[in-house]
Swiss-Prot record:
Expression in B.subtilis confers the ability to remove sulfur from polycyclic aromatic sulfur compounds found in gasoline and diesel (biodesulfurization), which are a considerable source of pollution. Modification of the operon so the start codon of dszB no longer overlaps with the stop codon of dszA leads to increased expression of DszB (in R.erythropolis) and about 5-fold higher levels of desulfurization of DBT. Rearrangement of the operon into the order dszB-dszC-dszA leads to 12-fold higher levels of DBT desulfurization. Pathway: Sulfur metabolism; dibenzothiophene degradation. Changing residue 163 to A: Loss of catalytic activity. Reduced flavin is provided by flavin reductase DszD. Homotetramer. Catalyzes the first step of the '4S' desulfurization pathway that removes covalently bound sulfur from dibenzothiophene (DBT) without breaking carbon-carbon bonds. Sulfur dioxygenase which converts DBT to DBT-sulfone (DBTO2 or DBT 5,5-dioxide) in a stepwise manner. This is Dibenzothiophene monooxygenase. One of its GO terms (cellular component) is cytoplasm.
Amino acid sequence: MTLSPEKEHVRPRDAADNDPVAVARGLAEKWRATAVERDRAGGSATAEREDLRASALLSLLVPREYGGWGADWPTAIEVVREIAAADGSLGHLFGYHLTNAPMIELIGSQEQEEHLYTQIAQNNWWTGNASSENNSHELDVKVSATPTEDGGYVLNGTKHFCSGAKGSDLLFVFGVVQDDSPQQGAIIAAAIPTSRAGVTPNDDWAAIGMRQTDSGSTDFHNVKVEPDEVLGAPNAFVLAFIQSERGSLFRPIAQLIFANVYLGIAHGALDAAREYTRTQARPWTPAGIQQATEDPYTIRSYGEFTIALQGADAAAREAAHLVQTVWDKGDALTPEDRGELMAKVSGVKSLATNAALNISSGVFEVIGARGTHPRYGFDRFWRNVRTHSLHDPVSYKIADVGKHTLNGQYPIPGFTS
């Protein structure tokens, strides 16, 4: 195949010999020490992304026959949560990487699956996302894909919110055919080298949270897409959603990963607050106690935080097992399978969003005024959750659950459901 990014990376270990959750936990411990400083600085988490590359976790979902870990979805979800607990931006980046790679299997050919999975595993490739545009609505795709005589395309335009594009090796991109050919108006998906001439990831990401996700824009100027880099036929990705085919599993999987990024951040906030309350918080004098850990209202708050997380964690793990069950059905997937999964994931997304927002803001009540000093960085937890939880309105996820419960309706397959 023609798809072969110029840079290669030596795979440092046999992934099958390690516990991926333990590997992630070890990395998280290292990153936790610099998380506040890096959040304040923004920019790119270059060193930390190289840590992930060296760990071989980038091939977590790559089947073992292609050299990867061959991990199941419940394990992958746990890894995302461990990483996000230490650093929301890194959890975000790794989560997007995990949503990108299965696109190969969901809509690509067997040859593409074998080639790309093998390359990801052997060279520890990062995958980047270039699907969204800053237009009137999510289906208003304007990056043009002009067909070429050899069956490929030429891309022109700008994508936005390209999480992980900068520093990636493989870029997943969508374009719309805008010529007078029979393909006019069709959306094509492709996996191309990020280093391809004409691809420019820009340093223009600016938000209150997720500051090290490189989620800025990416320009495409006369970018050649080779025929064997095109994933599926024109409109294959769109039709998969309309017909509830296996390719439409991309969305419930992505939504579940997002939910677990939030839960990881909530765990990180709770852990950091607990340590502060135990070691630095002062008791409230009128309470007549000797230590802040004896305050009945503080104790109640920690109880409420923990209970909220227990419920959301349990729901998330149950949904991860359902993802695996549905994934294993392959082409035998039914619209009912897909609908039940999306309804379940919608509930998890709501639980995780609310729990993470409440905990990341509520911890300030148990650490006290001194804990608001920037050196502690407690605000980063809320900023990270608040920023990404606006990806798609959680109110619509709640409505999806309500429609399913009351009227037996499944969420309508789409790019956010």
